[in-house]
Amino acid sequence: MGDNKNNYFDVIIIGSGSIGAPTALFLAQEGIKTLVIDKFPSVGQGSAKRAIGGIRATHSDPAKVRLCLRSIELFSQWQELYGDDIDWYKGGYTFVAYREEEEKTLKALIHKQKSLGLNINWLDKNDFLEVVPDINP
């Protein structure tokens, strides 16, 4: 029957989106035999394709924050590391507080996110208009 050694994998990843594909890449770089299974015919065709292409680390879960910070670091250096121009653009995200309760929640979250290494700030209306002057308040 031959050598079955090649029929086994150390890790099987379900999904080739924004989590599965880079996880497989890093595991393979470490010499870990990895298989990626996805219902779509090519990488990134599920929810990753429907995203706007941004990567944000503004989460409440510390593990997600760390993962996204690492993703930002990786994608910002992708061309230097792998030679492919992925049209990386360093942008930003804005979350608007329409009510006092939302403002309180977001301000509390900012402290947590800063403690995890995020470069994040609270902008009042005037500060925001300086950053994005063409917005219609």
Write out the residue ranges for each language-model feature:
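Beta1/beta-strand and adjacent pyrophosphate-binding region of the FAD-binding site
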Residues: 3-19, 35
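Short, flexible hinge/linker loops that cap or flank conserved catalytic cores
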Residues: 3-6, 28, 88
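Dinucleotide-binding Rossmann-like beta1-alpha1 core, especially the glycine-rich loop
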Residues: 52-131
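Short, intrinsically disordered, charge-balanced linker/junction segments flanking boundaries
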Residues: 134-137
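Glycine-rich FAD pyrophosphate-binding loop
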Residues: 28-48
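Short coil/turn connectors at secondary-structure junctions
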Residues: 8-9, 31-32, 91, 118
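Short secondary-structure boundary/capping segments within folded domains
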Residues: 26, 45, 85-87
